[in-house]
Every structure is written in structure tokens, then in C-alpha cells.
């Protein structure tokens, strides 16, 4: 990334949005991208674009499974989750959202033209509504349903 390019200013705007909205995840992400842009960007950014989402999903999955691994959630708790309507609803919604995210990944890889709008929407959601950046996958999944594709 060239210093003071349009890309620089867009990222700077996102960093400022992160600071204004007190969303450190967004601000730290932009700072990391600034640093990466000075260290062989032609080598690093293609790798980040290809593998960072998979790495993030891996880390998120580890975080979700950690209570089971630590024993805070045991087999009995898992079994009991099938005995309460709220838990069953949670299971069904979890299945639906996972399926939706899969559709989103497919749409984003087959129609990259939609990625920009999804990213801008996600960043605005993170900056102003205290959202988390899992939005592009779910948003792309919803978009795929709306478009009737994938």
C-alpha cells in the first residue's frame, strides 16, 4: 500500500470510526494492516486474503469449544440442551446461521462484486452498533437467499 494513497485514507477513516465508536477490534485490525502494508505487502496480503478468514474461523471454533474442553460444559449439559425449548431453539438457530454462513462464503467466492458492499456494511455495524465482524458471512448468506443463488 502506498503511503497517502486512497487505500491509506480509507483505512485511516475506519481506524477513526473504530476510535470514535470505542471499537478496539476495528482500530487494532486497521493498525495491523498498516504495519503489514510496510512489510512485503505483495507477499503478505495475498496470504492474509486467502487464509485469514479460515484462521479466524478456526480461532472462533476453538473459543466456542473451550468450555467443553475445560469441563465447564459436560456431556450432561449438552444432553440437557435438548430438553428445554429455549435450548432447542438455540440449536436450530445455530444450525441455520452456520448453514447461512456457508452460503455466504460460497457467494463471496463466486461473486466478489458483492464483497465491497458487505464489508462496508459490516464495518459500519461494527463501528456504530457494537457489532462483531462475523457479519460479512451471515450478510452474504442472507444476500444469497435474497438473490436466490448458491
UniProtKB/Swiss-Prot annotation:
It is a multi-pass membrane protein. It holds the Pfam family DUF441. GO terms for cellular component: plasma membrane. The keyword Cell membrane applies. It is found in: Cell membrane. The keyword Secreted does not apply. The chain crosses the membrane at residues 1-21, 28-48, 51-71, 88-108, 123-143. Keywords: Cell membrane, Membrane, Transmembrane, Transmembrane helix. Disulfide bonds: none annotated. It comes from the Bacteria. PANTHER family: UPF0756 MEMBRANE PROTEIN YEAL. Belongs to the UPF0756 family. This is UPF0756 membrane protein HDEF_0364. It comes from Hamiltonella defensa subsp. Acyrthosiphon pisum (strain 5AT).
